[in-house]
UniProtKB/Swiss-Prot annotation:
Gene3D superfamilies: SMI1/KNR4-like (3.40.1580.10). This is Cell wall biosynthesis/cell cycle regulator smi1. It is found in: Nucleus. The gene is smi1. SUPFAM superfamilies: SMI1/KNR4-like (SSF160631). It comes from Schizosaccharomyces pombe (strain 972 / ATCC 24843) (Fission yeast). Residues 68-91, 373-386, 425-434 have a biased composition (Polar residues). Residues 349-360 have a biased composition (Basic residues). InterPro entries: Knr4/Smi1 (IPR009203), Knr4/Smi1-like_dom (IPR018958), Knr4/Smi1-like_sf (IPR037883), KNR4/SMI1_regulator (IPR051873). Belongs to the KNR4/SMI1 family. Protein involved in the regulation of cell wall assembly and 1,3-beta-glucan synthesis, possibly through the transcriptional regulation of cell wall glucan and chitin synthesis. Involved in cellular response to nitrogen starvation and required for quiescence-maintenance by regulating negatively G0 to G1 transition. GO terms for cellular component: cell division site; intracellular vesicle; nucleus. Residues 448-460 have a biased composition (Low complexity). Residues 17-45, 68-98, 349-403, 422-504 are annotated as: Disordered.
Length: 504
């Protein structure tokens, strides 16, 4: 027996006995969150691009290649209450992440409140447990095989070990989600609980994150060496602009679900200047534009629960995959495409609310879209920067991203394929009143053919003849009545005269 075979057998036996003695699904019973053996590769905690050493494609330094940090107190801003001598006497002490700190934070009830929303509106998402309760209930009633694929929840040690391997701090809602369902078993089918997108367990999250971190490492090295394909680099974008770092892959993107064709639903632990820590994004092989599809993982689960309860779903007969019915008839959009469309629609609603104007008639697509910057700096009398009507009434304006998402009208396919579809248009010519002439002229009026004139004239003559016939009949009837009345009067006069003669 070879050494590798013996080692594999020993690991299997050890795993079997561990499964009998510990509730952990992934972590070893001997795992201690306080131990720290790996060399950190990322600034800790992962921050936005404004505070991170990783600055994208044109970076001169990157956290992937240079692990320099600025965590010592000597780099703090100068303050009037702090003496420079005191700072020099303090030795630099880098602040590192200790796995399990999130667990201790939860136990001490010192967790910070999650941010309400990017625009400051008081619209908190439902609790993660409530969203999963709705998803479980729907799956058990409508697709029991898919419900059985959902795994049991992970333990605290499992989640702590995941943070240890990834060297990051996971958002609270992600931890809570893993405590409820630690991914799903595929069962040999490409069926995902997220409308065809499979939920990953802790082990798969580690493997997928490691894979994409190697891709990000290669991408960063090629960028610094000047060997990156400029066509690929120029296609990397963010929606909304500035919310996600415009790179192909980033070590701060933690995949939580994937479609097994190279695309992922992930949480962003290193957002752009306009982004939010813990936001849910799409990235991968077909996602050059990185879309923000939810403010947090709790928001995203609420969206999924709503879509399931909405009733517009079907099970594909070929691969038994769950699909959401959305878009034109006879076309099946992937759930990732639907999420991207909704992100654009939410951005349009934001522009509508900001400008306070909307169009009430369909706009030809041939009209050029108006640039946001130019419209904001324009000094011309503005009819306003208006947006395409998306079929939603005014009651939907203040609904958060996880609210009602039904769109009763058909979605145009060409709108989905647009690169940056904010619905912005140039209405300077459309909204101006038309210059109508006072009187119709021969040039503007439509010419009438001779045949038409003759037909109209003949019809009019026929009507006049019929009218004259009716008048003649009426006159003759009146004459007959008058003659009868005259004869009757004459006879009465004769009778009166005869009576008077007899009396005399």
């Amino acid at each position: 027996m070879s050494k590798n075979s013996f080692s594999s057998m020993a690991n299997s036996v050890t795993s079997f006995f561990q499964s009998l003695t510990t509730p952990n699904r992934h972590a070893d019973p001997s795992f201690r969150p306080s131990r720290r053996e790996k060399q950190s590769r990322l600034p800790t905690p992962l921050q936005s691009v404004a505070a991170s050493a990783y600055s994208g494609v044109n970076a001169s330094q990157t956290g992937l290649l240079n692990d320099s940090r600025a965590n010592s107190v000597t780099n703090l801003p100068n303050s009037s209450n702090t003496s420079q001598v005191g700072l020099n006497n303090i030795s630099p002490a880098p602040v590192g992440y200790v796995p399990g700190s999130k667990t201790n934070e939860l136990a001490n009830n010192s967790m910070e409140m999650q941010e309400i929303s990017p625009n400051g509106s008081a619209s908190l998402p439902p609790p993660v447990s409530e969203s999963w309760r709705r998803i479980d209930r729907w799956a058990e009633e409508n697709y029991y095989e898919l419900y059985c694929q959902l795994c049991y929840g992970a333990t605290v040690a499992d989640v702590d070990s995941l943070e240890y391997e990834l060297e990051c701090t996971l958002p609270r809602d992600v931890r809570e989600s893993l405590y409820i369902h630690d991914g799903q078993d595929r069962g040999g089918q490409p069926t995902g609980i997220l409308f065809g997108v499979t939920l990953l367990d802790i082990e798969e999250i580690e493997e997928e994150s490691e894979l994409w971190r190697r891709v990000a490492q290669s991408y960063a090295e090629a960028t610094l060496a000047g060997k990156i394909d400029q066509a690929v680099a120029s296609r990397q974008a963010s929606f909304p602009p500035g919310a996600v770092q415009c790179v192909y892959a980033h070590p701060g993107w933690i995949p939580l679900a994937k479609d097994f064709v190279g695309n992922n639903i992930a949480i962003d632990l290193a957002p752009g200047p306009a982004g939010q820590w813990g936001q849910v994004i799409l990235f991968g092989r077909d996602q050059d534009t990185k879309y923000v599809v939810a403010r947090s993982w709790a928001d995203f689960l609420a969206i999924v629960a709503y879509d399931m309860e909405n009733g517009k779903w079907l099970v594909d007969e070929d691969d038994n995959s769950l699909r959401l019915i959305y878009g034109p008839p006879r076309e099946q959009w992937s759930y990732l495409d639907i999420l991207k469309y909704r992100a654009r629609k939410a951005e349009r609603r934001k522009f509508k609310k900001r400008d306070g104007k909307r169009t009430t008639r369909p706009i030809p697509k041939s009209i050029a879209k108006e640039d946001v910057t130019n419209s904001a700096n324009s000094t011309a009398p503005s009819t306003g920067t208006t947006v395409l009507d998306d079929g939603l009434d005014n009651n939907y304006e203040d609904i958060p991203l996880y609210g009602p998402s039904k769109d009763e009208e058909l979605i145009k396919k060409e709108e989905l394929e647009a690169d940056t579809d904010l619905g912005l248009i140039n209405t300077s010519e459309i909204n101006q009143p038309a210059n109508l002439p006072d009187e119709p002229t021969a040039e503007t009026s439509n010419p009438v053919s001779a045949t038409t004139v003759e037909a109209v004239t003949t019809t009019a003559d026929n009507k006049d003849e019929e009218k004259n016939d009716h008048v003649t009949e009426d006159v003759s009837q009146n004459s007959t009545i008058a003659e009868a009345s005259s004869l009757q009067a004459q006879e009465e006069e004769k009778e009166i005269e005869t009576t008077s003669v007899k009396q005399e």
